[in-house]
Amino acid sequence: PPIDRKIMRYAERGSRARRMMAKEYRHRAIVWGVQPQYCIDMLNWMVHCWGIVPLTDMLSLVNTRMIADTDTPENREQAFYDMAWLNENMIMRNRTHGGYKVLVDDLWEFCETMHADMVIMWEHMSCKALTGMHGQFEEQARARGIHLVWVCHDLCDPRVYTRQAIRDQLNAYMRTVMREEPLDPSIEVLPDENAW
């Protein structure tokens, strides 16, 4: 679509000019788990407030193989198999209910591949899969020297954990564990009353 080309031109122009999103990049993070549906600005806020660059998100790692993109009789037949494969490997089934390898081991492989020094772990308070693996994640992150930041939320209800309560968890970790100050203290606390 034309809008994709326009966005790509902006991205390429920024890349050629070596324009940074924030004045400093401090950490490279993998974002793991399912984020709350009501806090969509968190990744952008992490970059600008703390210099944490989110490299990729678990939700974007559904498919790592090529699916047919040309319309041919063979590809039409293959499309059925591709859709079945995607359905088998969707996020909640694959990552959080798909076993130890796809939930835990894959995370460390992505960290190694992308040279991440931090994992932002979304912890949906009702998800028993991630809660049950809490100790495993902690132990393995410590062994690998990767900072693991647990961020609790309720998937669809901002009354349980407000947007600011979510940001405060990261603020507390960065100040107490990392002993860092924000790049931009003015956005450490944001007014959310109109963010519906």
Language-model segments: residues:
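Cap/lid and interdomain-hinge subdomains that line or gate substrate/regulatory clefts
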Residues: 1-21, 175-196
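Domain-level signal for soluble alpha/beta catalytic cores
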Residues: 22, 28-30, 60-68, 165-168, ...
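A charged, amphipathic alpha-helical module
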Residues: 1-68, 96
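Active-site cores of enzymes that catalyze phosphoryl transfer or operate on phosphate-rich substrates
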Residues: 81-98, 106, 194-195
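Hydrophobic alpha/beta core scaffold segments
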Residues: 47-51, 71, 75-78, 91, ...
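Conserved N-terminal ligand/cofactor-binding loop architecture of enzyme catalytic domains
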Residues: 57, 62-89
